[in-house]
């Protein structure tokens, strides 16, 4: 089975795979070359996930701007 490009995965699938990659890297059982490949894949998955979140945030802002009565507050992306 071919590995999908991160940008072609759903957000949920990318996060699930990223979680798996992190677990494999944290185990410390991978040979160096395999660990580097997993790390590269993890970076790609994280970037794709961040891009999907950014796109979703922009869509929400556009939808809220369409409602003239809605109060817009900037999204800071940080938990309290």
Curated annotation (Swiss-Prot):
Chief location of this protein within or outside the cell? cytoplasm
Sorted alphabetically, which Gene3D superfamilies does this protein's record hold? Exonuclease VII, small subunit (1.10.287.1040)
Q: What are the recorded GO MF terms, alphabetically?
A: exodeoxyribonuclease VII activity
Annotated signal peptide: none
Q: Cellular location of this protein? A: Cytoplasm
Reaction(s) catalysed by this chain's protein? Exonucleolytic cleavage in either 5'- to 3'- or 3'- to 5'-direction to yield nucleoside 5'-phosphates
- Specify the enzyme's EC class, one word: hydrolase
* A cellular component annotation (GO) from this entry: cytosol
Keywords in alphabetical order, please.
Cytoplasm, Exonuclease, Hydrolase, Nuclease
EC assignment: the record states 3.1.11.6
Q: Which Pfam families match?
A: Exonuc_VII_S (PF02609)
* Superkingdom of this protein's organism: Bacteria
Q: Which InterPro entries match?
A: Exonuc_VII_S (IPR003761), Exonuc_VII_ssu_sf (IPR037004)
Q: Which GO terms describe its biological process?
A: DNA catabolic process
Q: Which NCBIfam families match?
A: PRK00977.1-1 (NF002137), PRK00977.1-4 (NF002140), xseB (TIGR01280)
Q: What does this protein do?
A: Bidirectionally degrades single-stranded DNA into large acid-insoluble oligonucleotides, which are then degraded further into small acid-soluble oligonucleotides.
**Which HAMAP family does the record match to this protein?**
Exonuc_7_S
Q: How does it assemble?
A: Heterooligomer composed of large and small subunits.
Tell me its family.
Answer: Belongs to the XseB family.
Q: What is this protein called?
A: Exodeoxyribonuclease 7 small subunit
Which gene is transcribed and translated to give this protein? xseB
